[in-house]
């Protein structure tokens, strides 16, 4: 289960228009979420609130052998008005779904030759424009360890932003560490530079997109085959594949410990306009360590997603595989007992089957305009929550060592719960390892 503060952090990117899929860091995000979901240990309680559209708080309390917890505060310079904060009404798919489909690229900006050049801004105007850009501050304190975590995000322009993360604790070397990054994104590519005080780490990441929607077109893809004559428009419109290839890599070097690392990766993911089955395939290579990894994730149905990963090391000849799945359900067993479904059943009114049709009451708009409704003026039907919203999800994973992880998540009234356990099938005498329950409430 994603924490409420992570959900708000992601909503900040959506509100400010930051494109998240142009980061090499998120290349394997879909497969990782399907096969590396966290299992709760012990009992964990979370209480969160979006007090204002700009400010949110979260409190966590855990009892897994010992009592611990954390306090989180988040402030955004832009109001997050589109965030559904109530745990009673928040869509479960937005909070619990692991399969994340790659979104369409942001619109391409017109070339410099198509628009007249704008006057060069003065340094004062540039500073004023920088101050107006969105920013976010996040802080979290862990108890009783007294560890402090902080994060600051500042947009410098629509395509450039700065991000600083820090952790402070007495047990860490030098009392803590700071990681700073500069991220620049365009519709076709995204790059990032990293600097960390932990070992003097310097890093660079980049991701380039090609194929699919990376080439702007003057006509809409719906025009393909839309003309019955099929002639001119079909010839002028290029063939489009409803998937996008992405290739990138990262390179980092530790100045103090004289260590280096590199990674290369390729991803193919279908786009939302794809009419077939959504899928994501990735391949990564770490040449210095000799690790090769490939993963494949598919949303077989709206209620079922599957993923698999295979890892191999060319130096030690060791291999590893993992499979994962999530299965959504609409019944009561999927989400325990959804009281809203019972309320809907209690509100069902018998339909009058008599020959006389009951006169429909005038709409509110017609009453305000002192007129009668038109014959074809009908109110849109209300969405059926039973059909459009899932009640819960069952997640499972297993590796080659017969270690199984099971997670059951759903909603009970205004509480979102997560019940998980891990089982080792290779050792029947010690098969049951742990059981945990996490409960989250937000308003």
Swiss-Prot record:
Q: Which GO terms describe its cellular component?
A: ERMES complex; SAM complex
InterPro entries per record: Mdm10 (IPR027539)
Subcellular location as annotated: Mitochondrion outer membrane
- Bilayer topology term: Multi-pass membrane protein
A Pfam entry, by short name: MDM10
UniProt keywords (A-Z) are: Membrane, Mitochondrion, Mitochondrion outer membrane, Transmembrane, Transmembrane beta strand
Instruction: Please indicate if the UniProt record lists Cytoplasm as a keyword.
Output: no
- What protein family is recorded? Belongs to the MDM10 family.
Q: What does this protein do?
A: Component of the ERMES/MDM complex, which serves as a molecular tether to connect the endoplasmic reticulum and mitochondria. Components of this complex are involved in the control of mitochondrial shape and protein biogenesis and may function in phospholipid exchange. MDM10 is involved in the late assembly steps of the general translocase of the mitochondrial outer membrane (TOM complex). Functions in the TOM40-specific route of the assembly of outer membrane beta-barrel proteins, including the association of TOM40 with the receptor TOM22 and small TOM proteins.
Q: What is this protein called?
A: Mitochondrial distribution and morphology protein 10
Q: Which organism is it from?
A: Pyricularia oryzae (strain 70-15 / ATCC MYA-4617 / FGSC 8958) (Rice blast fungus)
């Amino acid at each position: 289960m994603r924490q409420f503060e992570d959900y708000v952090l992601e909503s900040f990117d959506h509100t400010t228009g930051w494109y998240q899929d142009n980061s090499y860091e998120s290349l394997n995000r879909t497969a990782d979420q399907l096969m590396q979901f966290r299992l709760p240990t012990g009992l964990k309680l979370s209480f969160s609130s979006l007090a204002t559209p700009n400010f949110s708080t979260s409190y966590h309390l855990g009892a897994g052998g010992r009592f611990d917890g954390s306090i989180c505060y988040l402030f955004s310079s832009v109001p997050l008005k589109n965030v559904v904060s109530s745990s009673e009404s928040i869509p479960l798919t937005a909070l619990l779904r692991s399969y994340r489909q790659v979104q369409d690229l942001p619109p391409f900006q017109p070339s410099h030759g198509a628009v007249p050049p704008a006057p060069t801004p003065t340094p004062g105007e540039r500073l004023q424009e920088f101050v107006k850009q969105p920013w976010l501050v996040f802080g979290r304190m862990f108890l009783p360890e007294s560890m402090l975590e902080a994060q600051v995000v500042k947009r410098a322009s629509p395509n450039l932003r700065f991000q600083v993360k820090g952790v402070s604790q007495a047990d860490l070397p030098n009392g803590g560490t700071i990681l700073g990054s500069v991220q620049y994104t365009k519709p076709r590519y995204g790059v990032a530079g990293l600097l960390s005080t932990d070992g003097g780490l310097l890093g660079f990441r980049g991701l380039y997109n090609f194929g699919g929607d990376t080439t702007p077109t003057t006509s809409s893809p719906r025009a393909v085959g839309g003309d019955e004559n099929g002639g001119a428009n079909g010839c002028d419109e290029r063939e489009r594949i409803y998937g996008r290839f992405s290739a990138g890599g990262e390179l980092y070097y530790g100045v103090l410990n004289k260590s280096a690392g590199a990674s290369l990766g390729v991803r193919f993911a279908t786009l939302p306009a794809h009419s077939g089955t959504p899928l994501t395939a990735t391949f990564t290579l770490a040449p210095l360590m000799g690790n090769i990894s490939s993963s494949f994730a598919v949303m077989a149905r709206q209620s079922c997603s599957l993923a698999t990963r295979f890892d191999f090391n060319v130096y030690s000849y060791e291999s590893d595989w993992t499979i994962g799945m999530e299965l959504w359900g609409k019944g009561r067993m999927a989400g325990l007992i959804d009281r809203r479904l019972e309320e809907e059943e209690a509100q069902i009114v018998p339909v009058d089957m008599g020959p006389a049709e009951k006169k429909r009451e005038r709409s509110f708009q017609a009453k305000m305009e002192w007129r009668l409704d038109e014959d074809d003026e009908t109110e849109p039907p209300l969405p059926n929550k039973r059909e459009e919203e899932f009640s819960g999800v069952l997640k499972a994973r297993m590796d080659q060592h017969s270690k199984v992880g099971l997670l059951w998540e759903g909603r009970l009234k205004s509480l979102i719960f997560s019940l998980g356990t891990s089982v080792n099938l290779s050792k029947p005498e010690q098969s049951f390892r742990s059981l945990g329950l996490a409960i989250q409430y937000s308003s």
